[in-house]
């Protein structure tokens, strides 16, 4: 069993973004991400700080707009529309959840598709469903990159996604389907859940219940991606997967913390850079130079630590954009 190191993979992904930022800056384009937070949710504050730090690491300009808990929907919409009209802002992210008086869908819908770097707007969701150019939701896109980092060929694999949320479960299933996996989506009404999961070559857990996936639900040799982030009574973060039990059977597994979370933010950086390029009539023509980093941690002391090759761009040129899919 090997742990997929999301921190190392995210670092390589952000290095890729930083190279693209440098190339854009040489063209006079400074990528900019605006993050709108409404209220004092402690978790949201942590997430926003993380995104601001990631931007700084990649050379992306960031704007953090913090609105009062009592802000009205009209005030939030006005802020989003102002950012939408600002040509120097290339990506807009509204940190969720929002206070009860604000309609989240209305706010997300107000973000122009070309600046929707979270990939949540109806236009981007619809484009993804039919395979058209779009910005992919960051968490599902990060999951795909993590699976592929193991050397697993997704094509033809039996993939099971537990959870059908609009932000993770459904888009993760669509991206796996696009990679030619045979996909099953499981949810609270699914019968024979244990048997279905135990047949999965790729198992993505996004149900929001700590330890929901037990060892007997994991097929020997499977790739297990744990999207869950649950705060336990001990104050620690726990995933949706019983890590110790699943690790005995999986070939590859993501930890919590240090797995999917860092990759979500890294994919946001890539989407933001791509948005800046697109909005300035530029797209990347890539010359790829693989860079090796250690990304798996063997749980066996003294065990072999495999490496992966992340294709970073040794040269970046520009051409007219043909689509936004990343």
Model-predicted regions and their roles:
Residues 298, 314-316, 320-326:
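Low-acidity, Ser/Thr- and Arg-rich intrinsically disordered low-complexity segments
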Residues 38-52, 134-219, 223, 241:
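Glycine-rich phosphate/diphosphate-binding loop of Rossmann-like nucleotide-binding domains
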């Amino acid at each position: 069993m090997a742990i997929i190191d999301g921190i190392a993979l995210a670092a390589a992904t952000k290095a890729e973004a930083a190279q693209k930022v440098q190339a854009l800056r040489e063209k006079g384009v400074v990528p900019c991400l605006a993050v709108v937070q409404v209220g004092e949710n402690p978790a949201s504050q942590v997430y926003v700080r993380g995104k601001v730090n990631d931007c700084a690491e990649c050379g992306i300009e960031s704007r953090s707009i913090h609105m009062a808990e009592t802000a009205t929907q009209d005030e939030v919409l006005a802020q989003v529309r102002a950012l939408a009209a600002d040509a120097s802002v290339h990506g807009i992210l509204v940190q969720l959840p929002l206070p009860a008086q604000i309609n989240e869908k209305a706010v997300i819908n107000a973000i122009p598709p070309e600046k929707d770097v979270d990939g949540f707007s109806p236009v981007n969701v619809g484009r993804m469903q039919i395979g058209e150019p779009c910005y992919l939701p960051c968490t599902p896109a990060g999951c795909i990159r993590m699976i592929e980092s193991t050397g697993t060929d997704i094509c033809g694999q039996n993939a099971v996604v537990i959870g059908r949320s609009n932000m993770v479960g459904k888009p993760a299933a669509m991206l796996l389907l696009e990679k030619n996996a045979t996909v099953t989506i499981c949810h609270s009404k699914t019968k024979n859940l244990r048997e279905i999961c135990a047949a999965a070559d790729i198992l993505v857990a996004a149900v929001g219940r700590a330890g929901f996936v037990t060892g007997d639900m994991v097929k020997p040799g499977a790739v297990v991606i744990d999207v869950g982030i649950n705060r336990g009574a001990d104050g620690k973060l726990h995933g949706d997967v019983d890590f110790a039990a699943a690790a005995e059977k999986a070939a590859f597994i993501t930890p919590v913390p240090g797995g999917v979370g860092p990759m979500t933010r890294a994919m946001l950086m890539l989407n933001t850079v791509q948005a800046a390029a697109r909005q300035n009539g530029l797209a990347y023509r890539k010359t790829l130079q693989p860079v090796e980093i250690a990304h798996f941690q063997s749980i066996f002391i003294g065990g072999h630590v495999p490496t992966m090759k992340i294709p970073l761009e040794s040269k970046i040129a520009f051409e007219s954009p043909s689509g936004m899919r990343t």
